């Protein structure tokens, strides 16, 4: 299971969705990145859905997204990632 996490301006908590296939989450990641770079001007809204929670839909104002990341959710006990971005230095 892959998670896509979005951080919004002035919001302390990230929004996240889960997808089974890396290709699906990477496509959404690329779309959001295009919004952030101003390449996609067709809409001001980004709408995404979650495969883990079937009825979960998220719609955000594209100009409020400040960061996006993908990570693989581990099935090993204790392998869950805390919210936010991590630096491995």
Swiss-Prot record:
It comes from the Bacteria. InterPro entries: UPF0367 (IPR020885). Belongs to the UPF0367 family. This is UPF0367 protein P9515_01381.
């Amino acid at each position: 299971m892959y998670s896509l996490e979005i951080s919004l301006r002035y919001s302390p908590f990230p929004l996240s969705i889960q997808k089974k296939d890396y290709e699906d989450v990477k496509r959404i990641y690329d779309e959001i990145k295009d919004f952030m770079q101003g390449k996609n001007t067709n809409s001001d809204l980004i709408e995404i859905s979650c495969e883990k929670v079937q009825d979960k839909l998220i719609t955000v104002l594209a100009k409020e997204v400040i960061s996006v990341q993908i990570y693989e959710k581990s099935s090993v006990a204790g392998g869950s990632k805390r919210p936010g971005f991590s630096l491995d230095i």
